[in-house]
Amino acid sequence: MARDIAAPPVPTNHQELISWVNEIAELTQPDAVVWCDGSEAEYERLCGELVEKGTFRKLDPIKRPNSYYAASDPTDVARVEDRTFICSAKEEDAGPTNHWKDPAEMRAIFTGDKGEGGLFRGSMRGRTMYVVPFCMGPLGSPLSALGVEITDSAYVAASMRTMTRMGQPVLDELGDEGFFVKAVHSVGAPLEPGQADVPWPCNSTKYISHFPEDREIWSYGSGYGGNALLGKKCYALRIASVMARDEGWLAEHMLVLKLTPPTGAPKYVAAAFPSACGKTNLAMLEPTISGWTVETIGDDIAWMRFGEDGRLYAINPEAGFFGVAPGTGEHTNANAMKTLWGNSVFTNVALTDDGDVWWEGMTEETPAHLTDWKGNDWTPESGTPAAHPNARFTTPAAQCPIIAPEWEDPRGVPISAILFGGRRATAVPLVTESFDWNHGVFLGANVASEKTAAAEGKVGELRRDPFAMLPFCGYNMGDYMGHWVDVAKDKDQSKLPKIYYVNWFRKDDAGRFVWPGFGENGRVLKWIVERLEGRADGVETPIGVLPTKESLDTDGLDLADADLEFLLSVDKEVWREEAALVPEHLNTFGDHTPAELWDQYRALVRRLG
């Protein structure tokens, strides 16, 4: 007999959704099913339950109102790229940079065979199953899309209220027959009757699996952020990139900012950098140059479609920031610090003795005593970080003091420039303008950076990260590069965004960062805007157009002339070596690499002589 646990009254007449919820309930066998309505009362109830369970600890209500601290299991602290699968019908559609598994084989691992076996069978026993309807993007926007996540984690249900538009309004928008992405999540820790729970349930077996043709996500064994908040990377990038390929738009790992000069109209800029290259810092920039202001649209993901006027329009599909805490402080990102005043959840940071949070880089002075993320006493002599390097904050975007008024405009904002960049100590100048769209795609295809703590791997290795999408592209990366070429083919080239490559991380022979970065990066944005308006000079080099020394505003900047020359130099010898690395990279994708990128490579070699 099927357990019709989601029987009426349910808050929707969407029969496909109701029967799917029943099907998952029958498979996972939860003790109860709760349809989330997204209300403030529900959020408070979930947080209260998490406090009772020991998952959450309420922070000092004066210092950090309505905010909580959570510590994960020490084995469940980051995205697990080696357990992340793209289960496309054909292996070549996943491509060489994704892990592929046959979809039928993967489904058998999850649901077993003929009603027996499978990781999800009975995985929610002893737990509550939450049905979490959510919208990526402003409700009602033609650029937005809907999803429903089924999860046995109250931490996930609560976090989804911050990170997405969630609850009853989404079910209302969905109607009786609307399309939604199906997302199933279990921490994989069923409870037997009388068995005590742990504060952070998870399983040593982990799968984060995507079924692109079915627009489905199944995640097992992890309660951590990107593995469990399935609206984020799983939907907004991996599944959405496939939707975008099929429908002629772009789903990208990009911040979006609004830049307003002292006179003239604002410009909207999108930028793609790999993890830990300063996306959030740039999205919330406080320019040091007088009269220029930056406002935030989004800090991590952009969905972009061409409008009827031929311009590319972007929305931020998220409603919150899920940021890396360490390194975020008054000096590096004052606006992020102001955003975190309250209504936030902090995971794997350190706790102060007076009931607040702390992490490396938050303050100039390190506290004399803390409780570290593993719950141990900590002092500056401990010799280990107090916060995990990938510790996170989850906070509402609406609290950002410089959130742009149009951040939720259903039409999106028109993008004038797209920036790519990585963390490169060598070769790559401060800023390079592409010659045209396809050359810009070539620059994006060659993004490279050092590995960071946001994924499990060694720190400091150089890794190619095309478009900063390597861990997030839901299909063959060669086809993805081809899609970037294709979307612009029939467009008015004069209306396409200009593409730039930036590098804040150039080092001299002594290992010193030559460019001061942070707020000074506004000077580079100023040059870009003036280029867009035809008011700034540039010099053609073999790799693209660079600022002349005079056209980059360095007034009031303590930067030696030799350093400026170094930042704006192209060493042909070094660049011949750099160019020699490109064929191996493009060959990775075989005949999926678009011919246009090989044309760009050959043109680069010719220009380098």
Curated annotation (Swiss-Prot):
Pfam (any one): PEPCK_GTP
Gene3D superfamilies: 3.90.228.20, Phosphoenolpyruvate Carboxykinase, domain 1 (3.40.449.10), Phosphoenolpyruvate Carboxykinase, domain 2 (2.170.8.10)
Name by which UniProt lists this protein: Phosphoenolpyruvate carboxykinase [GTP]
Reactions the enzyme catalyzes: oxaloacetate + GTP = phosphoenolpyruvate + GDP + CO2
Main location: cytoplasm
E.C. numbers: 4.1.1.32
Classification via SUPFAM superfamilies: PEP carboxykinase N-terminal domain, PEP carboxykinase-like
Positions contributing to GTP binding: 276-281, 392, 423, 518-521
InterPro entries from the UniProt entry: PEP_carboxykin_GTP_CS, PEP_carboxykinase_C, PEP_carboxykinase_GTP, PEP_carboxykinase_GTP_C, PEP_carboxykinase_GTP_N, PEP_carboxykinase_N
Compartments where located: Cytoplasm
NADP found in the keyword field: no
Residues noted as binding Mn(2+) in the record, renumbered to the chain: 233, 253, 300
Enzyme class: lyase
Family stated for the protein in its record: Belongs to the phosphoenolpyruvate carboxykinase [GTP] family.
Function, in words: Catalyzes the conversion of oxaloacetate (OAA) to phosphoenolpyruvate (PEP), the rate-limiting step in the metabolic pathway that produces glucose from lactate and other precursors derived from the citric acid cycle.
Any Gene Ontology biological process: cellular response to glucose stimulus
GO cellular component labels: cytosol
Catalytic residues identified in the record: 277
